[in-house]
From Swiss-Prot:
Binding site for Ca(2+) 1: D21, N23, D25, K27, E32
Record lineage: Eukaryota, Viridiplantae, Streptophyta, Embryophyta, Tracheophyta
Matching Gene3D superfamilies: EF-hand
InterPro entries cross-referenced by the UniProt entry: EF-hand-dom_pair, EF_Hand_1_Ca_BS, EF_hand_dom, EF_hand_pair_protein_CML-like
Keywords (A to Z) from UniProt: Allergen, Calcium, Metal-binding, Repeat
Protein name: Polcalcin Che a 3
Entry-linked SMART domains: EFh
GO molecular function, one term: calcium ion binding
Limits of the EF-hand domain: 8-43, 43-78
Annotated Ca(2+) 2 binding sites: D56, D58, D60, E67
Source organism, top-level taxon: Eukaryota
Family annotation (PANTHER family): EF-HAND CALCIUM-BINDING DOMAIN CONTAINING PROTEIN (PTHR10891)
């Protein structure tokens, strides 16, 4: 059984998503993802493409908040680390 989201989990996800979604259109593009990941360290275009392919489950070329939430729930430790930076 999956762990329940705490109010802090939800707030962290919303804050990180808004930080990554720099143009505020409600979705994260590959360039926005790449820019955000660069603040975390060196990232190659191939790594960005792989992450987009993993997170963008509907294949529309953008990460929606729902897709981001699914990824965050599956990678809670990673998201907690990222939330400390953002």
């Amino acid at each position: 059984m999956a762990a329940e989201d705490t109010p802090q989990d939800i707030a962290d996800r919303e804050r990180i998503f808004k930080r990554f979604d720099t143009n505020g259109d409600g979705k994260i593009s590959s360039s926005e993802l790449g820019d955000a990941l660069k603040t975390l360290g060196s990232v190659t275009p191939d790594e960005v493409r792989r992450m987009m392919a993993e997170i963008d489950t509907d294949g529309d070329g953008f990460i929606s908040f729902d897709e981001f939430t699914d990824f965050a729930r599956a990678n809670r430790g990673l998201v907690k680390d990222v939330s400390k930076i953002f």
